[in-house]
Amino acid sequence: MTKKTSHHKAEQKEKRAGEESGRESEVLDHKIEELENELIGAREQADKLREELLRKAAEFENFRRQKEREALMAGSRTLETVIRELLPFVDDVVRIVEHAPELLEKTEDARPYVDGAELLKKNLVRWLEDKGVTRIDALGKKMDVNLHEAITQVEYPDVEPETVVEVFQDGYVLGDRVLRHTKVVVAK
């Protein structure tokens, strides 16, 4: 082979190598571009998933808080129901204690029963207070339809009209909720 031919072959070989290198470079550039696009897509997908995860976490937290509130409200309603059902018994014990002096005047044998009734009243009142229940103080106050139920009106010349002059039955509140209105007699 001649120098020219071998040089020509070498040039062709170089040219082919350059073309192949160029094609490889093109292929690599194309592959890099594909990978960059995939990366961009993956990042966008990750951002969407992150946002959705944050949204779901917030929804779950709101759901948890709502269930806590509902549980508290259910417990509160149950407590209110129990207390409302207990109030007539409280009234009975209070009446027994109020009439105890009359009973003791008749017979000292009633002393253990009176002492028991007083202890029962004390424990009932303490239990109600521990639960947040308070008796509505009505005597001498202005009639308030939110707290009082007037059962009658009576002439009291020395008392301002609409003033509670007698409590017929005690009323109670639990926090800001009226469990039972105080039944009252009001001055005309």
Swiss-Prot record:
Source organism superkingdom: Bacteria
UniProt biased composition (Basic and acidic residues): 8-30
Ranges where the record places region Disordered: 1-30
Keyword Cytoplasm appears in the UniProt entry: yes
InterPro entries in alphabetical order: GrpE, GrpE_coiled_coil, GrpE_head
Subunit structure: Homodimer.
UniProt-recorded name of the protein: Protein GrpE
Organism: Chlorobium phaeobacteroides (strain BS1)
Organismal lineage: Bacteria, Pseudomonadati, Chlorobiota, Chlorobiia, Chlorobiales
